[in-house]
């Protein structure tokens, strides 16, 4: 899924991967919440700091579609300098930023955004949830 090793990450930045403008020469990304016209620019939503809990940091690309295609995952990650893709983090980051609230995220992966994603998600959801909860508890203890 990415060049980062592991299955649980501290998210340091989030971008929306499906917000922008569809043009004749392809899709153009914009910062979520900005008008999708004029020169394209994507500014990541920066997470607040978490204590060091020994997890790698990642930039996540969020979209509204469940990704079951490794080529699409790669296009999103390469096009937006992301390490991971998901459906939640960027939306939370955007709303928090709009409201002037700090946000932080820990992401445990459930699948590799490929043809096996549906069965992988079902099989791995409980383990990933537990892993993320453990990491969050550790971070809170260190705050």
PLM feature segments, named:
Residues 15-19, 33-37, 82-87, 110-112, ...:
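Glycine-rich loops and low-complexity Gly/Arg-rich segments
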Residues 41-43, 69, 85, 89, ...:
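Generic structural signal for well-ordered, non-membrane alpha-helical segments
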Residues 59, 75, 91, 131-138:
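Alpha-helical scaffold segments in soluble metabolic enzymes
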Residues 1-80:
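Mid-sequence, gly/pro-rich, charge-dense loop/helix-turn segments that line enzyme active sites
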Residues 103, 108-143:
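Regulatory input/activation interfaces that engage signals or partners
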Residues 45-54, 95, 134-142:
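Generic non-transmembrane alpha-helical segments
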Residues 66-118:
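A C-terminal functional module that forms or caps the active site or interfaces directly
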